[in-house]
Amino acid sequence: MPTPSRAYTFARAQRDQLRQRYVTLRRCFRNDTRRPRLRALVDALLRGRAAVSMTLATCEMVLRSGRVLTAADVVASEVGSRSGPAFDHALELRLKKFYMARVHLESLLHFDGKAKYAALYVGGEGPDYGACCVLFERGGVRTDSTCFAGDTLTTVFDAEGNPAGLSSAEVLMRFATRQDVHRLGSLAYRDILDDGHPATPLDLQRLQDLLCVRDTLLEVHVHDDLLVEDIQRIIIARKVGRSMAQKLLRYDDASVAERQQMQFDDVRAYLAIHELADKRKIPVVGGTC
């Protein structure tokens, strides 16, 4: 059995505190008509999948390369090493103002620099800050993954990459193993449990909406390779599908020379995604094709 990541081992060591907070929450609903709502929330969170929001160009690159590359992976391939002054400098240039924030955060959470950042997906379009959402874990949930209540960078740091005021203890209260995502999520989304009449069912649409937004999503960290073979589905954002319809018409009508001169990079990536996904029998939903 593979050795668990340092981040997972670190998160697991703090599990007792999270479980105590979760037990306290459950006691609030012990003799309450809202208990089925809590059960539905737990079930939805446990069924969730890892979703990575990305540009069309990045999605095409993933399908061609066979795996998701982190910023550190890209930099390492450029400088020929994963450590040393040249690597650190190149990574700082790529991450810009968030470089020190990322270094601090990954040190605090015991990451090894190889973590892939995803979001928990329980339905809908998925995270709304990219052109497409790639769902992973076709073969099942990674056992040594970790999770975080919120987007680590935007929750712990401000828009300039400076600390947002959370103490290390407060940050760690948001961090857990993937197996505890239902406990962490139930505490993070307590408002959903308290909304409306106690006997009304869980508002699954509201949960999906919360999981789409950076400030309220549940971040998932995969401390291993994310491969094309793990892709379950690719979801093209609705906003991209609407704009792509007109671009495809212009692309079809353009000559070869015009296609080279005009800004059709996103169209080419869009078409390549469908072609590559079809070869690998990966469903692509949304868009216009």
Locate predicted features.
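Intrinsically disordered, low-complexity N-proximal targeting/linker segments that flank membranes
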Residues: 68-69
